[in-house]
Amino acid sequence: MSQSILTTRIMEALAAGRKALIPFLPGGFPDKERFFDELAALDAGGADIIEIGVPFSDPVADGPVVEQASLDCLLNGTCLSWLFYELGKRKGQYRAGLVLMGYYNPFLQYGLEQLAADAADAGVSGFIVPDVPLEESGPLREALDKHGLDLIPLVGLNTSEERLAAYAQNARGYVYFVSVLGTTGMRESLPTEVKERLTAVRRIFNVPVALGFGIKSPEQLYAFGDLVDGVVFGSALIAHIKAGGTAAEFMARWRG
């Protein structure tokens, strides 16, 4: 199988002497009309990968900022079929690789084979599913594999080396390292043990490492040096847009 477009985008960023930028934005936020304007602005502003959140009524891994934004999107009528239709109309317009991040129940209800086929047709390159354990990910992984889509593993501070090795066997695209215990959201500082665990992740995985959950500023990212290839930021971006800002302004800050 050829190298994932997600891996390629991260490697291109590293070759340019910078970390890969991976913004997260809930599908349909801040509203269904403006969402694609902000998506285009993220892409034009230098995003290497864009994670699009699929709204769900019980987002167990999300902090208050992302959770409220997702609930607002649900109330506005955001759903998978709408996302696929609208993304499909814009297929090929984005340089950034597109990843859908969502919970397993809506994906199961949609049908895993149909999910993978429609995602590929819409220009999506991968999925992150926080509530699917490794042992139960087989059917989803098989459906995604058929269409050349990546299932991005989520690992963190409490993931044992044995389990890291199990995730690494099938890892494609990149590995998402959860930098804190708990839900998403901005933190002023990150736990000191993050570097130690990242060292193990770097040793065990053969795909790029992206750091997320709790990232507030570029300075936090660069403190990790070569242990990290990219950064995922969601809560800070959402808060910026809610306060009247734009994705373009936010990306300019991260690009420096």
Curated annotation (Swiss-Prot):
GO terms for molecular function: tryptophan synthase activity. Pathway: Amino-acid biosynthesis; L-tryptophan biosynthesis; L-tryptophan from chorismate: step 5/5. Keywords: Amino-acid biosynthesis, Aromatic amino acid biosynthesis, Lyase, Tryptophan biosynthesis. The keyword Lyase applies. One of its GO terms (cellular component) is cytosol. PROSITE patterns: TRP_SYNTHASE_ALPHA. Tetramer of two alpha and two beta chains. Belongs to the TrpA family. This is Tryptophan synthase alpha chain. The gene is trpA.
